[in-house]
């Protein structure tokens, strides 16, 4: 019971309390999107005493129009994967997630920091999906690159690789977009919505792959490139999840959670002030409506 209460408290703090506080903490000393995002995300990791360690020789790449492929474990992905790309992440998410976590996902990630784009699963055609990706790459107003969970679903507790979805790999081939894997172990220990658990003092081990380029002289078709990427993903995944990293933690470099890349994009202050006004108004109006309803019922 205590673990369950701790889980719900953590979810509330991460997705409601801290985003709300951050919205009102921002002032004109924090003018840039990535700085604001960094202060929020790094604070979440510090509150949980979650530490990130790079276990690979390669580091995060910021090649033009790169697409990051990350393993999908739990809601903690959205906090940790922001940090491991040096705050250059733009998540692709089902639109339903915006309804489940409106303050964090829609207002905070999408509106303020341009770190989230949405699609409707089962209702977005492949051409429309590709146009969505292309539009965001051509109109990059935040310096963020696409991050995709190519497994297609959360796989907390499943420590073996699966075949990847083909869509974004095919797109990468057609549009000559490089791909980099960022596979992290232990993300779901920080926050796991399937088991209703949240832990502190978690060590997350992060592996950055080399950058894979869709060389059309080497890969004669989209399917050839897919098969290569799929095989590389499985090999990398097994290497990350098959090793005991805790015993070698002293050999790894700790990732700097405040390091940002390309922090040159400014927060939309009129939008921020509008969000503040809406939150304050809701905090006043909603309780007033509830109280009024109780008064009417008691009459």
Q: What is the predicted function of each stretch?
A:
Residues 54, 116-120, 214:
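Short acidic-hydrophobic, aromatic-tinged amphipathic segments that line or gate anion-handling sites
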Residues 41-45, 81, 107-110, 171-172, ...:
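Structural element of the ATP-grasp superfamily
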Residues 13-25, 48, 62-123:
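Catalytic core of membrane glycerolipid acyltransferases/transacylases, capturing the structured
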Residues 132-299:
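Non-catalytic C-terminal accessory region of glycerolipid acyltransferases
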Residues 125-133:
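Structural motif
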Residues 61, 126-127, 188-189:
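Short secondary-structure capping/turn micro-motifs that flank functional sites
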Residues 1-69, 76-80, 264-275, 287, ...:
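Membrane-anchoring hydrophobic helices of lipid-metabolizing enzymes
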Residues 58, 123, 185:
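Residue-level "edge-of-site" marker
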């Amino acid at each position: 019971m205590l673990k369950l209460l701790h889980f719900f408290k953590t979810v509330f703090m991460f997705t409601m309390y801290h985003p709300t506080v951050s919205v009102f903490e921002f002032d004109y000393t924090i003018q840039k999107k990535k700085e604001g995002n960094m202060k929020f995300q790094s604070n979440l990791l510090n509150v949980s005493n979650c530490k990130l360690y790079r276990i690979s020789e390669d580091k995060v790449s910021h090649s033009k129009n790169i697409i990051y492929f990350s393993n999908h474990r739990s809601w903690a992905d959205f906090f940790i994967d922001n940090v491991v790309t040096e705050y250059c992440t733009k998540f692709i998410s089902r639109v339903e997630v915006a309804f489940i976590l409106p303050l964090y996902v829609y207002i905070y990630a999408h509106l303020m920091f341009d770190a989230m784009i949405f699609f409707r699963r089962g209702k977005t055609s492949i051409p429309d999906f590709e146009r969505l990706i292309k539009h965001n790459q051509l109109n990059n107003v935040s310096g963020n690159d696409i991050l995709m969970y190519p497994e297609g679903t959360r796989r907390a507790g499943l420590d073996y690789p699966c075949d990847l979805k083909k869509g974004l790999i095919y797109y990468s081939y057609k549009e000559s977009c490089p791909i980099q894997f960022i596979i992290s172990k232990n993300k779901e220990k920080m926050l796991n919505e399937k088991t209703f658990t949240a832990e502190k003092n978690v060590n997350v081990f992060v592996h950055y792959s080399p950058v894979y380029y869709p060389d059309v002289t080497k890969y004669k078709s989209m399917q050839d490139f897919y098969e290569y990427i799929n095989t590389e993903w499985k090999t990398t995944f097994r290497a990350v999840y098959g090793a005991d990293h805790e015993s070698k933690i002293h050999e790894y470099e700790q990732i700097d959670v405040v390091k940002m890349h390309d922090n040159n994009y400014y927060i939309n202050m009129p939008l921020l002030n509008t969000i503040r006004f809406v939150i304050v108004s809701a905090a006043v109006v909603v309780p007033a409506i509830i109280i009024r309803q109780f008064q009417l019922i008691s009459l």
